[in-house]
Amino acid sequence: MVVSSDQGDSLDVHPINKKPIGERLGYWALNRTYGYENVLPSGPLFRSAEFRDGAVYVSFDYGDGLRSVDGAPLCAFEVAEEEGFYELATAIVEDNCLKVYNTNIKNPRFIRYGWQPFTRANLVNKMGLSASTFRVAASAACVIIDKVSQMQGFPQENENFAKGVSACYAGIAAGKLLIAGGCNFPKIPVHAGGSKKYYRDIYTAELSKDSVLVWQRAGQLPQAMAYGVSVSTADGIICVGGMNEQAALSTTYRIRVANEKAVVETLPSLPCTLDNMTGALLENKLYVAGGNKDGKASNAFYCLDLEQLSQGWQELPAFPGVPRVQPVSAAQLDADGQLCFYLWSGFAAPTEERDASLSVDGYVYSPAANTWTPLPEVMDEVGETVSLSGGVATAWDKNLIICMGGVDKDIFLRALQKTAADYLTHPVEWYRFNKRVLVYDVRLREWQTIACIPDVARAGAALVVCGENIFCINGELKPGVRTPEITCITIKK
């Protein structure tokens, strides 16, 4: 492509000075037709745009050395929340791409550059070749974060629990936010040989429009437990598997709330112990996948029909590839409108038969076809793979899956390989837990980073969705160190 927009005139869009246009045609021909790879063929050509954190991050082909041609601030960029309502925007170079923003526009969804018959647009590359004009809209499937709030209040009657837990069970029951179980190292840190403590108390809190949660102890689980799966249903919260100080568990419980008290019902047990797995509800069927099956990392996949409990848990075809402990999952419609089970990430410690593994790819299970199909690797805004192992995920709208949290793939894999003897002793920042909020579009089969929120950089958090609010509950900031924080992400409808 040869750019001529910078050679126009306010009264005549056709260039009077033809020489620069001819030279640019020559550069293009030398590179593309005659193979002179050392000749830059064009000015910056739009490649992609990431709409996140109140700005648009634009990358270009032939974009090395981005600058203004005249040394003045970059101009002719505009952004808008709604098509047709554009405002001029500031553009600055960051890491060889452009950050474009207007402080009056909180969530830009459209961007354009030099979008007039005559423009004084001044973006060039290192060769001084002008950038092409462009206009781009954010994907219609994009999620817009309205606000991020830190909820105030966490159960205080047990001073050990009050320090925050990891891997608790959580959900919505009778309109209340409920948490149960979980574990932490309340006295001595794990790196100093501290013992992990498991809990069995059940707490509930009313949800209101403010950020204050007033917790009440509503009862107890039949035993202390953590590291299982919990899902909210119209008839209570289902808690599956997990483990405690004594053993891994095969139990399944349903927690209902009536008259401010938790009522726990025992449902059919799994045919094996299962902990550190993932799970999701597809209509009336609860699926769980991966985790440690009878103490070993697995590819296990089971289903319980909540309307036919007498049939118990049914074993389904295992997902392909390596075993996955602490993967993430969500139930969402596929491109054909069929409800499916989506699975990503997970890890497995080394054994005599296989090396340590940390997965960044995924699979989708179709109940209709009873088969697994590969999914794209989790990708961030610059095309790097991301681990969601230990993170959380939830379906959103009709074709999106929101994911957050999880360990850093490189650091954690080295820990699994036992190449870092001092792994447990570093400060929180060293572990680089994932702070991105990522969205997967099942129709486009694409990932998008919509925000970077340090408060969701956790592993072992619980995720609860209520209306437009997503609650990220507790979890660990680094191995062995829990947080009592509950972060609420409000999605703009």
Where are these regions (language model features)?
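Flexible loop/turn segments at secondary-structure boundaries
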Residues: 8-12, 65-67, 119-121, 411, ...
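Generic recognition of long tandem-repeat/solenoid scaffolds
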Residues: 55-60, 96-102, 288
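Conserved, well-structured interaction surfaces
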Residues: 1-7, 12-22
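Kelch-like beta-propeller repeat domains
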Residues: 142-493
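Mature catalytic domains of secreted/periplasmic carbohydrate-active enzymes
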Residues: 6, 20-23, 39-43, 93
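C-terminal beta-sandwich/jelly-roll accessory domains of carbohydrate-active enzymes
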Residues: 64-141, 450
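Non-catalytic, well-ordered alpha-helical segments in soluble enzyme domains
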Residues: 17-35
